[in-house]
């Protein structure tokens, strides 16, 4: 496991694939500013996810067939497709892992929202893309990430 950014963790490459995960409960607890609004927190989390994704792209730019895969309830399908991801059916093993981690998901979502929040497991999607398709969409990813960072800077000034 490797931190690609504050809230994005990647597994070691295996069978030409890297699986990505959101940060841990400790990451959320110790990183999120207690005085930040829910919107600021969500923008920071999304910004860091994209920053981590861009770091993976930069680190593996020569392996165009390398696949990146992850499951989330945070990213909507339309945005994921703009970034070069395809939607895949979440496999049963991954769904069971998410169900077992549901208390942790409640805590991380609640930290982000600044109130008790329950993730909807029906909204979980698995996204997959290779480095080539992500590189083709890198400008879009950077544009979204920069907009989130600008929004954070504006809110903190």
Regions found by a protein language model. Give the residues of each.
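Terminal substrate-recognition subdomain of acyl/acetyltransferases
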Residues: 1-12, 67-157
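Acyl-donor binding region in acyl/amide transferases
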Residues: 13-83, 87-104
